[in-house]
Amino acid sequence: MIKKIVTTCFGLVLGLCVFGVGLVAIAILVTYPKLPSLDSLQHYQPKMPLTIYSADGEVIGIYGEQRREFTKIGDFPEVLRNAVIAAEDKRFYQHWGVDVWGVARAVVGNIVAGGVQSGASTITQQVAKNFYLSSEKTFTRKFNEALLAYKIEQSLSKDKILELYFNQIYLGQRAYGFASAAQIYFNKDVRELTLAEVAMLAGLPKAPSAYNPIVNPERAKLRQKYILNNMLEEKMITLQQRDQALNEELHYERFVQKIDQSALYVAEMVRQELYEKYGEDAYTQGFKVYTTVRTDHQKVATEALRKALRNFDRGSSYRGAESYIDLSKGEDVEETVSQYLSGLYTVDKMVPAIVLDVTKRKNVVIQLPSGKRVTLDGRSLGFAARAVNNEKMGESRIRRGSVIRVRNNGGRWVVVQEPLLQATLVSLDAKTGAVRALVGGYDFHSKTFNRAAQAMRQPGSTFKPFIYSAALSKGMTASTMVNDAPISLPGKGANGSVWTPKNSDGRYSGYITLRQALTASKNMVSIRILMSIGVGYAHEYIQRFGFKPSELPASLSMALGTGETTPLKIAEAYSVFANGGYRVSSHVIDKIYGSDGRLRAQMQPLVAGQNAPQAIDPRNAYIMYKIMQDVVRVGTARGAAALGRSDIAGKTGTTNDNKDAWFVGFNPDVVTAVYIGFDKPKSMGRAGYGGTIAVPVWVDYMRFALKGGQGKGMKVPEGVVSSNGEYYMKERMVTDPGLVVDNSGIAAQPSRRIREDKEAGAEDVERGAADEVRQEVQETPVLPSNTGSKQPQLDSLF
């Protein structure tokens, strides 16, 4: 009877086993063909951030969540490979993807625990999970993981599997892979790690947060000891090495990628351009983008701009605290303050601080980002003293929890504030359009709006040279005389009213030459010129400089620069004057490399005199250059003469009520535009003229950008003649070329010549030309308005 029972039980067990094996076999047959392809492993491309560099190789921007540096398995030190194997998978080189003995141990443990509590995942299984599967603890997921691990083992070598694991695994602190972790935790190359450091990092895969040595040093130390003992047991290290490693004091020096703060606006422009092309992939493909800007130029430009804004704001009253945090709750105040300050940036040496207390004497106790506490007395508070506990200032008063800015002024901390006024500077290579410097505002962190490329502003009188260029093309000369007198135009004002424009200074000079008019920035002359050549003609002609029709008002107000455009577009347009009449396009990207180091794309810019289209007659460009040299020499931009250079030219601009101030200056090599104004347009007051506030910024930057001696000035194009210090297109030269434009704006009879006190260099004069040429003034044919519309190409990528 007993024998029969035993036999029956044995048969049942055997049957169940066979049945179970059959079920497993069926599951394998059904599941295995559905396993994902291993292409992503065989052609592994880790997610690597977009890194942007200046032309001189400084990092100016990094975009992407994952910090990873791909490293081949042979470049990882053997001691690290041994440590990871000892910690995660001792039988890595013996099993076929699944460690059967490890599984058996885990099964027993789970049965005892009454559920799935632990696993026996091999390194291969972890690769399968990290690339293809979720982290949920279910038998189905573990079964698929085991099958996928087997498939991986059949397709890839052990070293390749290890390489994938070492580069893909997350190790905390935004570090993916051991090479990245070595930098982030120890600020070392992975090949420089000691045994103690290796064992500490090898403990992270199991639980990056729990075994983070910075956050949980005690648990991390226990994990390190466990790994070192395993290495000793596997005879990977000696007893002496283990003991030395255990006794070694580790120094955590978190790697912080240094990002040059002077070119953040440029980096953002590049990021946007790549995102438009690649979407989210732009942040994961490991692109390394080299730009055209140099950090030394950026730093000088930034400081020049900030100095002007600081000076303008110096007389302003204190506007109040930057923000406020509630410190009344029962939280750890020191930790709350430190955490809040860690998210703020020091800008222009203005350090963020939080008010901890206001004493009875109204001294203010603050905490700095360093953790240091400072007491500000009345002298340190300065202009901010009236804001201390001043209920009339509401939320902006200085009180406990207020966020303010301070600066170390010779050992004394004083309260300061960021200027409200904003500014931008953009500098281009006149021949290629390459951006050499671009600062989009006072501070990128507080306001990311890029005023150089995004701010649509009225250019004011900086637009006048384009009107004058159109006039030269239409038949006028630099000595053509125009009546600078008041004018009233019925029906040309708002709602059909009378338009009565005025010169900005309220002064009128009667008949003066075009040269004199542009030098003094006479509004009445610009309007009469436009009336003479026709709004339609000018509207089409000026598009050759790169302006869109929508940026050009089809009315006489165009003569005063009432359209809207960006500082970058203005600089690009002025490059036509600087480079001899060629249309080039601004660009900030030079080269793009892939994560493998191969060149993926290189900018092929339009170059003046080579492949760039001719936008205007080179003689026209030259004459405009010579006229605008007088603007610098004796006109509204004479402050730029402080550089002591004879090759510079330019034009100032100021809009109604001094809301916008401009200066665009150049020589044949560099064009630099400066714009200053409030983001919400309002008057800057009496100091808000282009020649007063914008020119000094330009001078400070260009003194550095043009260092290295005097330039030669623009080469005289063929067909330009000089007489009595004035320059003409050869066919326009007459013995008495002074042409008058009367009140109506219609060309009238020739008049006497006004001779100007200007000396021409010997290289500028074509002797005898005035005696040989006498003919009627004629119009230069207008090129199609889309001339120069061809854009520079970024080969293979864009």
UniProtKB/Swiss-Prot annotation:
Pfam families: PCB_OB, Transgly, Transpeptidase
Domain of life, source organism: Bacteria
Membrane topology: Single-pass type II membrane protein
Swiss-Prot/TrEMBL keywords: Antibiotic resistance, Carboxypeptidase, Cell inner membrane, Cell membrane, Cell shape, Cell wall biogenesis/degradation, Glycosyltransferase, Hydrolase, Membrane, Multifunctional enzyme, Peptidoglycan synthesis, Protease, Signal-anchor, Transferase, Transmembrane, Transmembrane helix
Compositional bias (Polar residues): 783-798
Compositionally skewed regions (Basic and acidic residues) per UniProt: 753-777
Protein's name in the database: Penicillin-binding protein 1A
Organism listed in the record: Neisseria cinerea
Upper classification of the organism: Bacteria, Pseudomonadati, Pseudomonadota, Betaproteobacteria, Neisseriales
